Amino acid sequence: MEYTNIGGVKIEKTAALAPMASVADRAYRIMAKEYGACYVVGEMASCKGLCYNDRKTAELLSVTPGERPMAVQLFGNEPEFVKGAVEIAERFQPDIIDINSGCPMPKIVSGGSGSALMKTPELFGNVVRAAVEAAHVPVTVKIRAGWDVNSINAVEIAKIAEQSGAAAVAVHGRTKTQLYAGKADWDVIRAVKQSVSIPVIGNGDVSTPELCREMYEYTGCDLVMVGRGSYGRPWLFRQICEYLETGSYSPEPTAGEKLDIMRRHIQLIVEDKGERVGMKEARRPASWYLKGMKGAAKFRDMCSELTTLDELERLIEKIKEQQGEHENEDL
C-alpha cells in the first residue's frame, strides 16, 4: 500500500471522505472509516462562532478514535478570528486542521468566506498564514477551480497556500458558480499538482473505483477525495481499496445487505444525537440506501414517520420480506 504524507500525518493512498456540511456528520464519517476511507474531514465550523463560544459550533469539532485520521474544517475571512478558532480547535486534538476556501453556498460566500476567498488572494494568504502560525498540527486548505469560468485561479491560490505554510491543498474541479452542476475539470487539478510541491488532493466526480484510479493517473494527485458519490454507499470506499490493490472489487451489496448497512448508519446517528433528534435526521440517509429498491418511494414515506429504533427494526424486516418476494418473482 502506498501512503501520502501530509505534514507528518501518514495516510493510505486510497480514498478520503470529503467535507460535506449537514451530511458528513460523525455517523457518516464512522461509516466511511469502517468501509475503508483513509481519512475523513468534519463539517465546517465558523471561526467567529468558535471565538464567540457557540456551543453548537464547537460540537462540530469533536473527534472520536474511530474517525482518525481526521481533519476538522474551519471557515472565516478574518485572520484574528481564524487564529483564535485554530487554538480552540486544537483542544479537540484533530490530526489536521483544514481551512475551507471552496464552499460555494451563498450564506458562506456572502460573508467573504469559503470560495469568496479565492477572489481575494492576499487575504486568503493572510488567513492561511494565521492558521499555520497558531496550529501545532498540519494545516490544509480546500479550494475550487476558481470563482467562475473567467477566473480560474486555482494554481495561483494553491501557490499562495504553499507559500503561507499549508501542508496540502485539496482541489474541487468545479468553479463557485457551477456549484455542483456540470463536470469537474480534472485538468485544473493536474495543473495544480504540477505547480506546487505540497500534496494535492483531487476532488470531483469520483463515484466508482474506476474513476478513482483514473483521477490518480490523469491528475497525478497524491490523494483522492470522495463526496457525493458516497451518499448511501459507504462500501464505495472498500471497493476503491480493493480495486487499487487488486484490479477488481466486490459487487454492490444486495438489498438485504444495504438494509443492514442502513440500520448500522442510523444506529450511529441515534448514538450520537439521541433517538428523538437522530430518527428525524436519519430520514435523509435512509432515502439514499432505499434508492433503487422496489417500493422505495413507499418505504421512504414510511421511514419519515419513524420515531424509534424499534420501529426501524420492524420496517427493515418488512422491507426485507418484500424484497425477497420480488427477488423470487424475478427468478
Where are these regions (language model features)?
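Flavin-dependent oxidoreductase catalytic cores
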Residues: 1-331
